[in-house]
């Protein structure tokens, strides 16, 4: 093949047709020798035949196709392979669609899917309006929705959208924008490309913005006072409705009507936070909740067939959520399960070399790393990594210290692990792993000892949050600068916690559940590095510690894990919580 990005698709087709691979070769050789051929195809004066026995064969003129494309189609008919390149893919798809050669159409569609980028996604989407390639159309359209903010900045094709095409994009729940300001700014850019002919469309486009979700100051200064809005009589009732909706939201909080009102309806999240398993009510739980950051709501998606697990690790890689190691109050696990969120199926994969409870897990360059932990006898300094393609775990260099109940993350191509418990004391040390040389190095120690810690890369720093210092559960947090090799303190959380989940969603650092020194908790809060402040988020429905979190982006069925837009309910009262609070925890 001429392009590496398409090679996987073609090798798959060869495997599907193994029975005919040799037959295809034989028939093509016969064609080239003029045997078993009874017609000649003529395209723009070019004859598709051999030099043998041409005099008695019927000639067919084929209009509307170039000789080079017909040559590829004929060769595909005999060989079931076709060279697809950036230069020929569109013309080849058009020709294949004309002659209903669906194998080539699918191959070209797969190739173009791999070529989708900010600059060409709109062009490819519009191209699919004329030819039957529904999967390519869906992929291109979702690429536009998922990368809207970046696409608006990079694409010149965006400026050529019709008003209806633009309106259809910005009204979608799947539009991936963190703030509605970005949608309004996109409208201004689109109108600004041709103001005399486009400013009249502001009244059509403005209601598609979730105006009541904007910051009031931005709305008043940038939307209400903009000339395109002020000069439109049709925009005035839209502005009034938005102000009323903003007032109701601020005074009364979220209500069931918010999801039916187009001005207050949250977009669907691009990424879903999964909170998996943990320790609840004095025993491990199999509970799984997902967090919809755009609606600030949790959804219970527990699969009752799954066994309980606590003090495990969770990681997302290439379409799967992996649950690694852990403890069920009897056994310490080396087993690993993976969950496919699209099909909602669970499968066992290869086990680790060691049993690991209190394990630290992270992902780096298509490998899952599992480090330290407790095997039921000793705290571990060993580490290993998993490669999904081979379904194998491989031991890597051991850490400098034994660490259970530590936490790990990746930043700038390296693995960082911080804190933990070595069997004698809570640790303030931290290490970094360089996979290129398979080597661990100690970095500057944290300012506090932290076992049951949460560690996450956020912005340009590694954050170490909460934990247990040997005497108290901690509210404090600190950030590591890898360039300066220094730690600095950041504002404290509202609540002390250890053994909690930690992740970054929509540029906010979330801490989920945990143990506060007296009880397991369902409390959630988030930190914004831009404001250097913590904020309360909606509580989980289940009290638990020893859970693990991971973030799953770009799900095609995201609505199944997000708050339902067609049946939204407001805040869940705490007396409806399904699991009671418990002071029981597994001893460190």
Segments and roles (model prediction):
Residues 67-71, 75, 87-90, 102, ...:
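Amphipathic alpha-helical interface elements that mediate macromolecular binding in regulatory proteins
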Residues 200-588:
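Kelch-like beta-propeller repeat domains
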Residues 30, 76, 80, 96-102, ...:
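Generic recognition of well-structured, leucine-rich alpha-helical segments
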Residues 33-120, 145, 160-196:
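Canonical BTB/POZ domain core
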